[in-house]
C-alpha cells in the first residue's frame, strides 16, 4: 500500500510500527487505541469491529479501526488467544501541553506467553518456554510471567523437548537456534504454538546464577532477555531460577497424561471427569495451580512422598481443625498474581485491599496449623511469614470502599495523611461556605430567587434573572450574559472557589502520590509474599487431598523395595466418583516379584481398559502423596509410566493409528526400565491380523526379556495366551463373564487364566445392531472357527457352501509356485525370539512386497 503524503502523526505511527512488524500496534489517540493500514484491515475481521479510513477523500485513504481505551483489554485478549502479539503505544505526555505531535512510545508487547492482565482471569499457569541447543543437548527454560515462576532443565532429544512443552501446555515457544522444517511443522501446526526468536542472552546473571550447564544458562538467559524486552520494566516479582531434572519425577508423556485424563477429560477437553477435577477441593487459586503441578509431576522420592502422606493423615485425624483451616483459606486471594501486578505497576486499590484481606487471614491460618500439634505440620507453620507490618500499612492506608481505578479518588483512608485530610475538609466545608454566602447575599440584595450554580466554564456564579437586574449589588461583577438572565461573581465567592479548586487539585495529586508510595512499599515485600504464597498453596493442596480422602474413603498406600504390586479391591477413582460407590465394581491387582507381565484377554466393554487405568491412577495418586481408592495398596516406586490406551489417529501430522501405536511402543521399549509401568491396550490392531499378532508377540517378548518393566498387555489375539508356557514372568488374566440361557453378562471382575471367548457378537448385540446382521455374524463365526488358524479367511459365503468354494476365496501363502517358495524361505530364516518389534514390522513389510 502506498504511504505518500503522510502527516507527522502517521509518520510517527509508521516509525513505531517498523520496530514491531510481527505485532498488532495499538496506537493511543485520545480515548481510543487506533490501528492503521494492514493491522486495521486484519483486526477488523478478527475482532468484528468497524473498518473505516483516515483522510477519506485522499487518493489513498488509510484503513483505520479502533477500540475504546477503557475496554481495550477484552480485544487484546481475543488477539492473544488467536496466537498474535500486540504492541501497546501510549501517549507519553499531556496532549494539551504537547508541542507538535504528542510523544508516543510502546510500553509493553503482549504475547501469548507473557499475558499478565486479562479481562477473563484464569487461575491456571501460562508458561512461556525457551529452548536452546548446543549440538548435543537441549536447554529448556520456562516462566509464568503472571506468577514469577522460573525453571530450567536440560533434555537429551527433541522428542523429550516436545513432550515437556506439551506437559507445560505452553502457547508460545522462544527459540535460540534454527529448527528443522519438520520440527517447526510439529510445533506450529501440530501443537498450535507461536514461535518467537531471541539471539541475545540477558546480561544480568544474578537471576540465573547457579550450577547450570551452558545450554541451560543460555536458554534461561534468552528467556529473560525476551521477557524484559517485551515487558519493558524491571520485574521484581520474578522468582529465583529453579533447576529441575525430569528424572526426579514420575515420567509421563503428554499422550500418557491425556489417555489417563489427568488434568482434563480427553473427550471433552474439560476439567470435569479428570483426576484434577476429582482431587480439587482447594480454596485458593495458588492451591489449584500447585495441585495441577503435583498431578503432572508425581514424586519418585519415598521420603518426600511420606512427608506429604503424614500431613494428610494429621489433617484427616482432626476434622474440626481441618474444617476451620478450609474456611480460613477461602479468604486468601491469589498472592502470586497480586504480587506480579504490583511489580508491573498495575496494582489498583482493589488489588491492595485483597492483599490486605489475605494477610489479615494469615495469623488465623497459622494458629489453626499450630493447633494440630504435629512436628510435620510445624514445618509449614515455621514457613509462614504473617507480614504484620504490611497488613497494618494496607489496612490503615487504603479505604475499604476504594474504587478499582486510581483516578476516581477516595482511595486513602481519612486519618492517614494530615495534608490530604485538610484538603478534603476544605472541599467538604467549602460547600457549606457557599451555601452561607448564597443565603447572606439573598437577604442583603432582596433577590428572593438568587442562587449559586456551577459549571466548568464559569465556575461558581450567582444566577440573576432579567427581572431582578435592578437589585444586583455593586460588588457583583458580570461573568456571562444569557437571553433571560445574567451570571455574576463576587470577590468572596471567587476566593472560596479558588480554595475549593486548589483543594480538589491538590487532593487528587496528593492522593495519587500517596498511593504510588504505598504501592512502592508493597513491592519491597514481594519476595516474602511469594514465599508465603508457596506455603499457603502447599497447605491448601494437602487439606484438599485430606478432604477427598475422607469423602471417598481412600486409604494410605505403602511402598516396598521388592518390586511387588498388591492392590486389594482397588477402584478407578474417577469412574467411581462419576458412577457412585454402589455402582462401581472393584478389582484387585497383584504382581509378585517374579511376575512382570499380565496378559489380559476379554471382550470390549468388559473393563480391561478401566483395569489398566485403575492401576495407573493408583500409582500416580500414591506417588503424588495422595491417599488412594482401595482397601489396601503396597507398591514399588515407579520411575515412568508408558501407555497406549485407546485408538487415535494423529490427523494433523498425517499419522495413522498404527503408526502412532508403533511410535508410542517405541518410546516405551526404548525408555522404560525395570522400574517402569507399561500399559498397552490392543496393540497391533491398526494393521492386518497376522502383522498385528506378530508385532504384539514380539513386543511382549522384548519387554519380558530385555526391559523387565511391570506391564499389562490387553489383547484380542487369544493365540498370545500360549506365551505363558514359555515366558516365565508372564501370567494370563481375563475379564470374567457369566453365560446363562444364551445371554452373557460381563462381571467386570478380573480372574486368573485366559478368556475362552471374545464375545464380540454379544457386544454388537448390546450396541443394538440388527438381528439379521447378528445372525449372519454367527454363521460367519461358526465357519471361521472350523478353519485352520494358519489360513486367513478373505470371505465366508452365507449358509453352507462346498469346501472348494471356500478355498477359492482364500489366499494361498504356501502353494507350489516359485514366489511361495521364496516367501517360505524368508519366513524360515526369521529368528523371532531375537527380533525387536520394529525389525519384525520391517520384515513383514518386506514379505508383503514379495506377494
Curated annotation (Swiss-Prot):
InterPro entries per record: DNA_mismatch_repair_MutS, DNA_mismatch_repair_MutS-lik_N, DNA_mismatch_repair_MutS/MSH, DNA_mismatch_repair_MutS_C, DNA_mismatch_repair_MutS_clamp, DNA_mismatch_repair_MutS_core, DNA_mismatch_repair_MutS_N, DNA_mismatch_repair_MutS_sf
Binding site residues for ATP: 602-609
Keywords of this entry: ATP-binding, DNA damage, DNA repair, DNA-binding, Nucleotide-binding
SMART domains assigned to the protein according to its UniProt record, in alphabetical order: MUTSac, MUTSd
PROSITE patterns for this protein: DNA_MISMATCH_REPAIR_2
GO MF term set: ATP binding; ATP-dependent DNA damage sensor activity; damaged DNA binding; mismatched DNA binding
Function: This protein is involved in the repair of mismatches in DNA. It is possible that it carries out the mismatch recognition step. This protein has a weak ATPase activity.
PANTHER family linked to this entry: DNA MISMATCH REPAIR PROTEIN MSH1, MITOCHONDRIAL (PTHR11361:SF34), DNA MISMATCH REPAIR PROTEIN MUTS FAMILY MEMBER (PTHR11361)
Family membership: Belongs to the DNA mismatch repair MutS family.
Protein name (record): DNA mismatch repair protein MutS
